[in-house]
Amino acid sequence: MDIWLLCWVTLCLLAAGHSEPGVSQTPRHKVTNMGQEVILRCDPSSGHMFVHWYRQNLRQEMKLLISFQYQNIAVDSGMPKERFTAERPNGTSSTLKIHPAEPRDSAVYLYSSG
């Protein structure tokens, strides 16, 4: 029996770090089909210099994907560059894009700023 393979990517964006409210995250949860583009966006509190994207796969430790200092990349050693891109063009909001989504991308994606 032929069944189309679906990629269920659950993406949770959690704010961590600074104690002041004001971090906007969209979407908080995301389920997508295999091959689709996933765009995660986070807007930190005003004045935050650093932003960090993390990924935690099931039963594994959390791993840093990329860090920005304002719009410049500070660390990107954990970023799988073949299908993942991240940017912080204006030094405030940041996006993480996955394209095309694959089953191995199923994880919790976290964002922090400070």
Curated annotation (Swiss-Prot):
Residues 21-114 form the Ig-like domain. PROSITE patterns: IG_LIKE. Glycans are attached at residue 90. One of its GO terms (cellular component) is plasma membrane. Keywords: Adaptive immunity, Cell membrane, Glycoprotein, Immunity, Immunoglobulin domain, Membrane, Receptor, Signal, T cell receptor. InterPro entries: Ig-like_dom (IPR007110), Ig-like_dom_sf (IPR036179), Ig-like_fold (IPR013783), Ig_V-set (IPR013106), TCR_beta_variable (IPR050413). It is found in: Cell membrane. Its main location: membrane. Residues 1-19 form the signal peptide. It comes from the Eukaryota. GO terms for biological process: adaptive immune response; cell surface receptor signaling pathway. Probable non-functional open reading frame (ORF) of V region of the variable domain of T cell receptor (TR) beta chain. Non-functional ORF generally cannot participate in the synthesis of a productive T cell receptor (TR) chain due to altered V-(D)-J or switch recombination and/or splicing site (at mRNA level) and/or conserved amino acid change (protein level). Alpha-beta T cell receptors are antigen specific receptors which are essential to the immune response and are present on the cell surface of T lymphocytes. Most probably, the alpha-beta TR is not assembled due to incorrect folding of the beta chain. Alpha-beta TR is a heterodimer composed of an alpha and beta chain; disulfide-linked. The alpha-beta TR is associated with the transmembrane signaling CD3 coreceptor proteins to form the TR-CD3 (TcR or TCR). The assembly of alpha-beta TR heterodimers with CD3 occurs in the endoplasmic reticulum where a single alpha-beta TR heterodimer associates with one CD3D-CD3E heterodimer, one CD3G-CD3E heterodimer and one CD247 homodimer forming a stable octameric structure. PANTHER family: NON-FUNCTIONAL T CELL RECEPTOR BETA VARIABLE 17-RELATED, T-CELL RECEPTOR BETA CHAIN. This is Probable non-functional T cell receptor beta variable 17. It comes from Homo sapiens (Human). The lineage of its organism: Eukaryota, Metazoa, Chordata, Craniata, Vertebrata.
